[in-house]
Amino acid sequence: MSDTHIIAGMHSVRTALKHGADGVSQVWVEARRRDKKIRDIVALSKSAGILLHQVDRSELDTIAPGVNHQGAVAQVEVPAALGERDLEGLLHNTTNPPLLLILDGVQDPHNLGACLRSADAAGVLAVIAPKDRSVGLTPTACKVASGAAESVPFIQVTNLVRTIRWLQSDGVWVVGAAGEAETSLYQTDLNGPLALVMGGEEKGMRRLTREACDLLVKLPMLGSVESLNVSVASGICLFEANRQRMNR
């Protein structure tokens, strides 16, 4: 039996129904609400043949305790990770310069979930991670992702350096974030096909991953702390890339 998790909130439930309805096993909505957002969720659930419960708000509070569920909750299967062939298909079928996020050694499911959420907001084509020494899609990661685990392809690869080399041969520029780099993120042209590489919580990028990057950049740190959480740093890098692309 597949692992399942609970997602809550209008946007999260609607995203799961639109992008991964096959993995949604049941949906609960607040019975007394009749607004358009609830009607959309009800319609999407019924059209996909998903078990739908219209219940009191107190029951939603029990299913998703301590969460601002906004009157909508769903039980969702943990999505299966994709592989190298799926990445090739995604890359060759996109019409815009791809933006990819590579996570090397992220082991905390909360961080993975937060990175997926940032990736979704930034329009990332896929999130890539190695199979070894990295967390995969878990119920916790999916819960933190708030629907992004269903909308952003998560690719697990056997050999990360080999995947980076393949991306480079296909015209993707690979930029890694490293505190000791001399070049600032804000001095770097991030237009065009791009993969941003972020290291794990403790040791950052592994040596071979670092050496495989086309360029290493740093996030200027103006305070007393030396580094940022990987999900925060990922969001900063992704949205700087988007800022540059929007201003072209």
Descriptions of predicted regions:
Residues 175-231:
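Active-site/ligand-binding-proximal alpha/beta "capping" segment
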Residues 63-77, 145-148, 153-157, 191-199:
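Short basic, glycine-rich beta-strand/loop surfaces that mediate nucleic-acid
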Residues 44, 118, 166, 208-209:
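Hydrophobic/aromatic ligand-binding patch that stacks against planar heteroaromatic rings
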Residues 15-18, 22-23, 29, 38, ...:
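RNA substrate-binding interface of SAM-dependent RNA methyltransferases
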Residues 1-90:
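N-terminal positively charged helical leader segments and presequences
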Residues 58-63, 80-82, 160-164, 183, ...:
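A short acidic, often aromatic-flanked loop/helix-cap motif at beta-alpha or helix-coil junctions
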Residues 121, 140-148, 207-248:
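Structured adenosyl-cofactor binding patch, chiefly the S-adenosyl-L-methionine
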Residues 9, 111, 119, 174, ...:
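Conserved RecA-like P-loop NTPase ATPase core
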